[in-house]
C-alpha cells in the first residue's frame, strides 16, 4: 500500500509539473574581472560577471516546475561548477544547470527546477551571479561565424530572455589592441571537451597572396592535433577582436597528423586572408606550447618567412552564487467586500523574513435562477466571519414568435429580432421559391465567355444568357494521291476546337546543305504550301576556325575568311588599324615608379599609366593677423618637394597643472592645431611611492593605493594569491645536494629545484651464455649506488701442461680480458729419476727462423756514463727495422734507420747501473726510414754453463763458431761486439759470452763497441712473450723478470726486447706471435747475425749460419 501511495505521489508531481516564465526579472550588473593577464576588456576574455535578479512566488510556482534563461552570444561559463542554486537566507529554492553553447550553439542556457522548499505561502527573491565569456568568433565553424557579428567595440546592449520576459543591460567592450595587419593567433578552452580550439590567421597582404605555408605543431610533445575538427578558409574581413567574420573556400593543400597541421596555398585574391583552426588536446590545457609556421609571399612582394613559438596559459575560474530574501504571505478574512494587501513592519538589518498580509472578504456562494422577463436581479444572503454568504442571481429569458415568408434566394435564412422592452422576440424565416429558368447560348465577338441571368418576378421565368467566344480552329493540310484539293470543316461544341482538313496533291522538293553551330548533322524537311516547293535542309557542323588579328598601316579594319574544305580549318584574318594611345601620370603609395600599358580592343584607345611616388610635402604653418585661416599648396614637378603653406589666426590658451614622474617641475606649452586651444602644461613632481607586495589567502589579486598628503609618501599595496609550486629533481657535478626555490611572478608557478650529487657507480662484469656483449645501467635513487652490469660472451680456452719440482699437481687459470683467450696451466710433478736424468735444463727452439715474421720493430738504446762528481752523460740510439716476408716466409731486413742523441747532465737518468756505471733503457719510437743494404757480420760466440745446487756436473764450454762476412766494398770499418749473458733459473745459472764482429754502413766510428748482456730469471717455467691485449693494455708476462744491461752506440745484432723494470717485461713482437722459450728469444735476438743458436740438454750451442748467411747475401743483391 505504501509503495502504491509513493508511486501515486510521484505520478501526481510529474503530472502537475509545468514550465513557468519570468522568474529572472532584472539585469542588475555586468562587470569584468581579469582572469589572467589580458590587455583589454573584450567580450571573449574571461571573466564577465552577470548579476541577475530573480523571483519565485509559491502561489504560481510549484516544486518540480522548470524555467529557462536563454543567453544569446554566450560561449561558456568560466567556472568549474556544473550548476548554481537560487538561495535566500541559505535555503535552496531552485537548482539551475549550466548548458554552455561553446562550439555547438550560438547561445548558452540556464535550465532551472523549483525545489520542494517552495510552498504557496512563500515568495523568494534574490540575485544570482554568473561568471561567463561571450562568443565573438574564433574559428571557421558556422556557430563562431554567426556569433562573430554579435557585438562591436564600444557600447553594446546585452539581452537575456526568460520566456517572454527580456532583461537587458548596456556594457562597453574594448577593441583588441593587437595590430590586425600582423599574424593573428587565438586559443580558447572548450570545457565540455577538455580541448582547445586554436586559430591562426596569416599576416595581411593588401593586394592578395601569391603563395604561402602556415600552420602549427606541438613543441615539446605535450599537444596532439585533432585532424577531424579542422577549418581552413579565407575571410573577407575581421571583427573588432581580429576573428574571421566569413569563410570561403580556396585552393590549398593540407597536411595533418597528431603532431601538427599545415596548409600550403596559392593565389589568394586581394581583400582576403587565409586562416586555419583546429581542436588540440594538451597534457595540460592551461599550459602548453605551439610552434607556428609562417611563410608567405604577398602579390607584388617578396617571400617572407617568420616562424614563431607561443606558450599558452589558462585563466582562473570564478564561482557562481546566489542570495536573496524570503517573503511569507498570510491571509486574514475581514468583513470588507474587496481584497486588500498590507505589509507588516520589516527591518532588513534585523529581520530575515518579510511578511505580507492579505485581507480577504467573507467567501460567497453564487446561486443562479431564471425567469421570463427583461432585467437581471442580484440578492445577497449575509453570513458571519468564518461562514459562507450566498449570492442569488436571477437571469431573465424571452419567448419567441416565428414568421415565415418566401424569397428568390436559393437558401433558407433565419433572423431573430430581440425586443428590448418586452419578453417576446420575433423569428423571421425566409424560404427560397425559384422561378423556372431558360438558358440561351450564343457566340459573340469577344475572346471571353459571359453568363447573364435575367430574373423575372416571382412566378415568372428567369433567363440565363451564355455568350461564348468563337471556337479555335485547327487547320490540317495533308497530301493525298489525287491531283486536286479538298477542304472539310468539323465544328466542335462551344469552347472546343473546330477542325479544317485540307487535302493537297504532293509538292516538288529542293535539297539545300548548310553549316550550323552544332557538332552533329541534321536533316530538316520544310513543307511549302500546297502548290509550292518543299525544302530539305541538311545542316552540317562547321569547320574549326582560327582567328588571327593583326595591325596594319591602313586606317580601316578588314576581315577576310579563308574557307577550307569540309573537315578542315577555316581562317579568319582580322586586320585592325593601330589604336590611339593616351598617357596618364598619377601618384600612388609606393616608393618607386611603374609604367603599365593597358591594351584596349581594336578601335579603342590604349592607356599608358605612369605611377609616380608622391612628392614629399613640407607643410609650413604660420600665424598672421587675420581672423581666418588660409591654405596654399605649391606643387613642385615630380620628384621634388611640394609645399603647403597654412596661415592661421592665433589660438586661445588654457593652463593645466598635473603631476608627473620627474623630481622637478616643468612648464610645457602644447600648441594645438590652428583654430583650437593651446595648452600650457605645468608638471609637478609626484609624491614618493612605496609598493608592497604580499600574499594572502584569497584566490584573486587586489591593488590598493593609499594616497598621502602632498609631499608625503603614497603606498601601493598589492595582494597576490599564492603561486602553485612544481618540484624538479636533477643531478649535478657537485658532491652535495642543494634546494633552490625560483619564485615566479604572481599568478604563475614557482619552481623548487633540487640538485643531487651523482650516485657512485659500481661496474660488474660477468659472463653469460649469449654470443654478444650487453651493458645495462641500473639507476638507484639519489644518494645510493648505480650499477653498470656488463655481460660478456665466454672467452675461448687454451690448456698448457708443465712439469715442476713439487710433489703435487695443480692447475691455474689465467683469465684474459673479455674477447681474449683464457689459459689453463696444469703444473704436473716429476719422479726423482726424472729429475736426476733431467740434470740440465733443456731448451728447444720450436720456432725456426723462416716461421717467425716481424713486420715493424723500433728500438732505442741509451748509453749512460757517470764519472764521480762530474755528473752523467748519455747517448740514445733509435733503430727501426721493417721486414717483409718473401714467398718462403723468410724474414728479410729491407731498411734500417738509426738516430743518435747525445745528452749530459749532472744527474743520472733513471735506470739500472752496472758496476762500470753504464745503463741501458729501451723503448719504442717511430723515426723516418731510409733504405740501405744490410751487411753480413762475422760472429764469434762462446757459451759457458755453470750449475749450482743439486746439479754438480760443473761448467760446460761450447765450441766457437766463426762466421766471416763477405765485406762490402763500401764498408769502412767493422764493429766487434762481445756479449756475456748470465741467466739464473732457480738453483741453476747459465752464463753465455760471445763476441760479434760486424760491419756497419750507418755509424761512422773507428772505435770498437763492447756490449754486456745480463739476464736473470727466477723460475724454470717457460718464459712467455708479453703481448698487448685487445683492450690496449699491457698483458702480464710469465713468472720471469728479466733484466738487461747493455753498452753500445750502435747495435745491429741484439733485437730482442730489454727492460729496466724488475717486475714486468715489454716486447715489440706482434700480438699474434707464438709464445717462445728463452732459446727462442736468443734466436730472435741474433737474427741480424744471420745465424740460429739452439741450446740443447747438454749445454752445447748449435749454430746454423753458413747457409743462412749465403741466403741473405743472395737476397741482398736484389734489394
Swiss-Prot record:
GO cellular component assignments: cell surface; extracellular vesicle; hyphal cell wall; plasma membrane; side of membrane; yeast-form cell wall
Keywords, comma-separated and alphabetical: Cell adhesion, Cell membrane, Cell wall, Disulfide bond, Glycoprotein, GPI-anchor, Lipoprotein, Membrane, Repeat, Secreted, Signal, Virulence
Membrane topology type: Lipid-anchor; GPI-anchor
SMART domains reported in the protein's UniProt record: Candida_ALS_N
Superkingdom of source: Eukaryota
Glycosylation sites noted in the Swiss-Prot or TrEMBL record: 471, 543, 579, 651, 687, 723, 759, 845, 987, 1050, 1061
Propeptide: 1099-1119
Lipidation (GPI-anchor amidated serine): 1098
Disulphide bonds in the chain: 73-150, 96-112, 205-298, 227-256
InterPro entries: Adhesion_dom_sf, Agglutinin-like_ALS_rpt, Agglutinin-like_N, Agglutinin-like_N_N2, ALS, Fibrogen-bd_dom1
ALS repeats (start-end): 365-396, 401-432, 438-469, 474-505, 510-541, 546-577, 582-613, 618-649, 654-685, 690-721, 726-757, 762-793, 798-827
Annotated localization: Cell membrane; Secreted, Cell wall
The protein's name: Agglutinin-like protein 3
Amino acid at each position: 500500500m505504501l509503495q502504491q501511495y509513493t508511486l501515486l505521489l510521484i505520478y501526481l508531481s510529474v503530472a502537475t509539473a509545468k514550465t513557468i516564465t519570468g522568474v529572472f526579472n532584472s539585469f542588475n550588473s555586468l562587470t569584468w574581472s581579469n582572469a589572467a593577464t589580458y590587455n583589454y576588456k573584450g567580450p571573449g576574455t574571461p571573466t564577465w560577471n552577470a548579476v541577475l535578479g530573480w523571483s519565485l512566488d509559491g502561489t504560481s510556482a510549484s516544486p518540480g516546475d522548470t524555467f529557462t534563461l536563454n543567453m544569446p552570444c554566450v560561449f561558456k561559463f568560466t567556472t568549474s561548477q556544473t550548476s548554481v542554486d537560487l538561495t535566500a537566507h541559505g535555503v535552496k529554492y531552485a537548482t539551475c544547470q549550466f548548458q554552455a553553447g561553446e562550439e555547438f550553439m550560438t547561445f548558452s542556457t540556464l535550465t532551472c527546477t523549483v525545489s520542494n522548499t517552495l510552498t504557496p505561502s512563500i515568495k523568494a527573491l534574490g540575485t544570482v551571479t554568473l561568471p561567463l565569456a561571450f562568443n565573438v568568433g574564433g574559428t571557421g565553424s558556422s556557430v563562431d561565424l554567426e556569433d562573430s557579428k554579435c557585438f562591436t567595440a564600444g557600447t553594446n546592449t546585452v539581452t537575456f530572455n526568460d520566456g517572454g520576459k527580456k532583461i537587458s543591460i548596456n556594457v562597453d567592450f574594448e577593441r583588441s589592441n593587437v595590430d590586425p595587419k600582423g599574424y593573428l593567433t587565438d586559443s580558447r578552452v572548450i570545457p565540455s571537451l577538455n580541448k582547445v580550439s586554436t586559430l591562426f590567421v596569416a599576416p595581411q597582404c593588401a593586394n592578395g597572396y601569391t603563395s604561402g605555408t602556415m600552420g602549427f605543431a606541438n613543441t615539446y610533445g605535450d599537444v596532439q592535433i585533432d585532424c577531424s575538427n579542422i577549418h581552413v578558409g579565407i575571410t573577407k574581413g575581421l571583427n573588432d577582436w581580429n576573428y574571421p567574420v566569413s569563410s570561403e573556400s580556396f585552393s590549398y593543400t593540407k597536411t595533418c597528423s597528431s603532431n601538427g597541421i599545415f596548409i600550403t596555398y596559392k593565389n589568394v585574391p586581394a581583400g582576403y586572408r587565409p586562416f586555419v583552426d583546429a581542436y588540440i588536446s594538451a597534457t595540460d590545457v592551461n599550459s602548453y606550447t605551439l610552434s607556428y609556421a609562417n611563410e608567405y609571399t604577398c602579390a607584388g612582394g617578396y617571400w617572407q618567412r617568420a616562424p614563431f613559438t607561443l606558450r599558452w596559459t589558462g585563466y582562473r575560474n570564478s564561482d557562481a552564487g546566489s542570495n536573496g530574501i524570503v517573503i511569507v504571505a498570510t491571509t486574514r478574512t475581514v468583513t470588507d467586500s474587496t481584497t486588500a494587501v498590507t505589509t507588516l513592519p520589516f527591518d532588513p538589518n534585523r529581520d530575515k523574513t518579510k511578511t505580507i498580509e492579505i485581507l480577504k472578504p467573507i467567501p460567497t456562494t453564487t446561486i443562479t435562477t431564471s425567469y421570463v422577463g427583461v432585467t437581471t436581479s442580484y440578492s445577497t444572503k449575509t453570513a458571519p466571519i468564518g461562514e459562507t454568504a450566498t449570492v442569488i442571481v436571477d437571469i431573465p429569458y424571452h419567448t419567441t414568435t416565428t414568421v415565415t415568408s418566401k424569397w428568390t434566394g436559393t437558401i433558407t435564412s433565419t433572423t431573430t429580432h430581440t425586443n428590448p422592452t418586452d419578453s417576446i422576440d420575433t423569428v423571421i424565416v425566409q424560404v427560397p421559391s425559384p422561378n423556372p429558368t431558360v438558358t440561351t447560348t450564343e457566340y459573340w465577338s469577344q475572346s471571353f465567355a459571359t453568363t447573364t441571368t435575367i430574373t423575372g418576378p416571382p412566378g415568372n421565368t428567369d433567363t440565363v444568357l451564355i455568350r461564348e467566344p468563337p471556337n479555335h480552329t485547327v487547320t490540317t493540310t495533308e497530301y493525298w494521291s489525287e491531283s486536286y484539293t479538298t477542304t472539310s470543316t468539323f465544328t466542335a461544341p462551344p469552347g472546343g476546337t473546330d477542325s479544317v482538313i485540307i487535302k493537297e496533291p504532293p509538292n516538288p522538293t529542293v535539297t539545300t546543305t548548310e553549316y550550323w553551330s552544332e557538332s552533329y548533322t541534321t536533316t530538316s524537311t520544310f513543307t511549302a504550301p500546297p502548290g509550292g516547293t518543299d525544302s530539305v535542309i541538311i545542316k552540317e557542323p562547321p569547320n574549326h576556325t582560327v582567328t588571327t588579328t593583326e595591325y596594319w598601316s591602313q586606317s580601316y579594319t578588314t576581315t577576310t575568311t579563308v574557307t577550307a574544305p569540309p573537315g578542315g580549318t577555316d581562317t579568319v584574318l582580322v586586320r585592325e588599324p593601330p589604336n590611339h594611345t593616351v598617357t596618364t601620370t598619377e601618384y600612388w603609395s609606393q616608393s618607386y615608379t611603374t609604367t603599365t600599358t593597358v591594351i584596349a580592343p581594336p578601335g579603342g584607345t590604349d592607356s599608358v599609366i605612369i605611377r609616380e611616388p608622391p612628392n614629399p610635402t613640407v607643410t609650413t604653418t604660420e600665424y598672421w593677423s587675420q581672423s581666418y585661416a588660409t591654405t596654399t599648396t605649391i606643387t613642385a614637378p615630380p620628384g621634388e618637394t611640394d609645399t603647403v603653406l597654412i596661415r592661421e589666426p592665433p589660438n586661445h590658451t588654457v593652463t593645466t597643472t598635473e603631476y608627473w614622474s620627474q623630481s622637478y617641475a616643468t612648464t610645457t606649452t602644447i600648441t594645438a592645431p590652428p583654430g583650437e586651444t593651446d595648452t600650457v602644461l605645468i608638471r609637478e613632481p609626484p609624491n614618493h611611492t612605496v609598493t608592497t607586495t604580499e600574499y594572502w589567502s584569497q584566490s584573486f589579486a587586489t591593488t590598493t593605493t593609499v594616497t598621502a598628503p602632498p609631499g608625503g609618501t603614497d603606498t601601493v599595496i598589492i595582494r597576490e594569491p599564492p603561486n602553485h609550486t612544481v618540484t624538479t629533481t636533477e643531478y649535478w657535478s657537485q658532491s652535495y645536494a642543494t634546494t633552490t626555490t625560483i619564485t615566479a611572478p604572481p599568478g604563475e608557478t614557482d619552481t623548487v629545484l633540487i640538485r643531487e650529487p651523482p650516485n657512485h657507480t659500481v661496474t660488474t662484469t660477468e659472463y653469460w651464455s649469449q654470443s654478444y656483449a650487453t651493458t645495462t645501467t641500473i639507476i638507484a635513487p639519489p644518494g645510493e649506488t648505480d650499477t653498470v652490469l656488463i655481460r660478456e660472451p665466454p672467452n675461448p680456452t687454451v690448456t698448457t701442461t708443465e712439469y715442476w719440482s713439487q710433489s703435487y699437481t695443480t692447475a691455474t687459470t689465467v683469465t684474459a680480458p673479455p674477447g681474449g683467450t683464457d689459459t689453463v696451466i696444469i703444473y704436473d710433478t716429476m719422479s726423482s729419476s726424472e729429475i736426476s736424468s733431467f740434470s740440465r735444463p733443456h731448451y728447444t727452439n720450436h720456432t725456426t727462423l723462416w716461421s717467425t715474421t716481424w713486420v715493424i720493430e723500433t728500438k732505442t738504446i741509451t748509453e749512460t756514463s757517470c764519472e764521480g762528481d762530474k755528473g752523467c752523460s748519455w747517448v740514445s740510439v733509435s733503430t727501426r727495422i721493417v721486414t717483409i716476408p718473401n714467398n718462403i716466409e723468410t724474414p728479410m731486413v729491407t731498411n734500417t734507420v738509426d738516430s743518435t742523441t747525445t745528452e749530459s747532465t749532472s744527474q743520472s737518468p733513471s735506470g739500472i747501473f752496472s758496476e762500470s756505471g753504464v745503463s741501458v733503457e729501451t723503448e719504442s719510437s717511430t723515426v723516418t726510414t731510409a733504405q740501405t743494404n744490410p751487411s753480413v757480420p762475422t760472429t764469434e760466440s762462446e757459451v759457458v754453463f755453470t750449475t749450482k745446487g743439486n746439479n754438480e756436473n760443473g761448467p760446460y764450454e761450447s765450441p766457437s763458431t766463426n762466421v766471416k762476412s763477405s765485406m762490402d766494398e763500401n764498408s769502412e770499418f767493422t764493429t766487434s761486439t762481445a756479449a756475456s749473458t748470465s741467466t739464473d733459473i732457480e738453483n741453476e745459472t747459465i752464463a753465455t759470452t760471445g763476441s760479434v764482429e760486424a760491419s756497419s754502413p750507418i755509424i761512422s766510428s773507428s772505435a770498437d763497441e763492447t756490449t754486456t748482456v745480463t739476464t736473470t730469471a727466477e723460475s724454470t717455467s717457460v718464459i712467455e712473450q708479453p703481448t698487448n691485449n685487445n683492450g690496449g693494455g699491457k698483458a702480464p708476462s710469465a713468472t720471469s723478470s728479466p733484466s738487461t744491461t747493455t753498452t753500445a752506440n750502435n747495435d745491429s745484432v741484439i733485437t730482442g726486447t730489454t727492460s729496466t723494470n724488475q717486475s714486468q717485461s715489454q716486447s715489440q713482437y706482434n700480438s699474434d706471435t707464438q709464445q717462445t722459450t728463452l732459446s727462442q728469444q736468443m734466436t730472435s735476438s741474433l737474427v741480424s747475425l744471420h745465424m740460429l743458436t739452439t741450446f740443447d740438454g747438454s749445454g752445447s750451442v748449435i749454430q746454423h749460419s753458413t747457409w743462412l748467411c749465403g741466403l741473405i747475401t743472395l737476397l741482398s743483391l736484389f734489394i
